[in-house]
Structure formats: C-alpha cells, structure tokens
C-alpha cells in the first residue's frame, strides 16, 4: 500500500476493524483506574505481523463486514462511558508509563489509528 507498509487495502481495513475491540478494552481498563502495563511497541508489532500473516487473504466483503460490526460496537461502547470515566487517568505503557485518560486512549488510538490508515487507503486508491 505504501513504501513502508506493504499490506493490501483489504488487509489494512481488516486490521483497523480488528483493533477496535482491543482499543476499547484498553480504554475500559484506564476508565476503571487500572494501569495498562503489558502493551509494548514490540507487542504491537508482533500483533500486527501475526494479523497480516493470518488474514492476508481476507476479502473486501469480510473486511467491510468486520469493520461495520466492530466500529458499531466500539461506537456503542464509547457512548456508554461517563464523563467521569473518560476523565479518569492511569499509567499506560505505550505512553512510557505516563498517566493518560480514557478519552485520550479513545481519541489517540481508536480514532487517530483509524484516521492514519484511512489516509493511507485513500492515497493507495488515488482519492
């Protein structure tokens, strides 16, 4: 898809869809005040490589179905957070252990991550 990311558009869409449940679980943990210490950049790279290997042949239909389902479930989960939960902070290992809020996790991981890949998909498709 790009010079640095060789995954197909379909695989990227499936990847984004697959990450929503994980990102929501992290936001829920932070919202409950629990430190998230087991997520490292090495673990992210390993997860991404495993996903690419296991789902290299995903079809457009299955990738879009997963995206629709998981994004709807993620949206419902985000809407269920209270203001207090969104404001709660706890240490997060991807931020070098700095305390971050659940809102930050939602905005920086679920939303920014999707937006980042959408930009790459658009470039690949010439849009």
Language-model features, listed with the residues they occupy:
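Short, contiguous alpha-helical
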Residues: 1-46, 89-127
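Acidic/histidine-rich alpha-helical segments that form the ligand environment
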Residues: 47-88
